[in-house]
């Protein structure tokens, strides 16, 4: 058995080396530039984002914090995971159009600023089943904040654009935020 293996070892080594060299030499040939692609649609979305931290059924929960967080006046180091409803109107009972699923972290040491990583997953209407990926800085005490749209799925493939967030209402730690999202796709 060992002799057979020793006889096959050079053959297996050769096959492995050839497969590695073929893989490396073809790495760029599998990716072709997208020639002449131009986004053909522009979409403006308007909805309200409900971030609920308090109560029996929170939609955002703290999953981590740094040891120094309690000594920070801006909660630096806190990480939250969220599955927040997106609705047509500012009232939490208005029609739900999707969910903001992702996380945000308090990443500034001198002010309250989040780094937001969210998929806006649409569950109703024309864009049901589609998502938009949003990633960026959200300095929550600024009147209007802008975050980039970096991709999407379904109707929003190849999406790019930006989202503008404006705080509508804050009660304790819970917030309702108005969003205007401008997407080329």
Curated annotation (Swiss-Prot):
GO terms for cellular component: apoplast. The keyword Glycoprotein applies. GO terms for biological process: phenylpropanoid biosynthetic process. Its main location: secreted. Residues 1-27 form the signal peptide. Keywords: Apoplast, Glycoprotein, Secreted, Signal. It comes from the Eukaryota. It is found in: Secreted, Extracellular space, Apoplast. Glycans are attached at residues 70, 111, 128. Belongs to the plant dirigent protein family. PANTHER family: NUCLEOPORIN-RELATED. Homodimer. Dirigent proteins impart stereoselectivity on the phenoxy radical-coupling reaction, yielding optically active lignans from two molecules of coniferyl alcohol in the biosynthesis of lignans, flavonolignans, and alkaloids and thus plays a central role in plant secondary metabolism. This is Dirigent protein 2. It comes from Arabidopsis thaliana (Mouse-ear cress). The lineage of its organism: Eukaryota, Viridiplantae, Streptophyta, Embryophyta, Tracheophyta. The gene is DIR2.
